[in-house]
């Protein structure tokens, strides 16, 4: 789908495996920042990043790590952009069931202008609290899955048969499990928010995923540090592990 000299638009911050995968294909990522505190897509900025070499845009909703969720209007903007420039869309939807506060996950597969040019990726590992399983799937039109199959065997060969049977058996036993995920993680988010209430750390809104962003600018210990430095200090000084937004 992409090759030597092609460009792929990726928003920042983003899951750190996108960039290496693009570079392995001989293409390069063009990074478009999502700005705090909302981290919403700025479609004008995305359009400015498109060049004659652009072949694909990668989107992730709910988004790791900004915790934002693309709206139906966002998907329509994406559809217009992809149609105007004949772009493929790789949609990372592994957190599809982890949306909160009335937010709704909108898949690219549900948008008529996107379904024919998109690959949507899903994960049972994320949905079933077992990321080590590495069990997932991709939905795309036949011409795109043909290209996917050309490389899939050499990337993963296959998913362990026992794990596939385990997931199938679990879903047959608990067909309503996905409906329990949002309340489960909402309770976890509330516990973290209440634990940090009254501290100098400010929780930013989290509409989806199992991540939460923290504004530490008011902290005397951390306020002057960048995110990587702050993560190191938190770990070494107080034994709290965090993940910086910087790649």
What are these regions, as identified by a protein language model?
Residues 1-247:
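PLP-dependent class I/II
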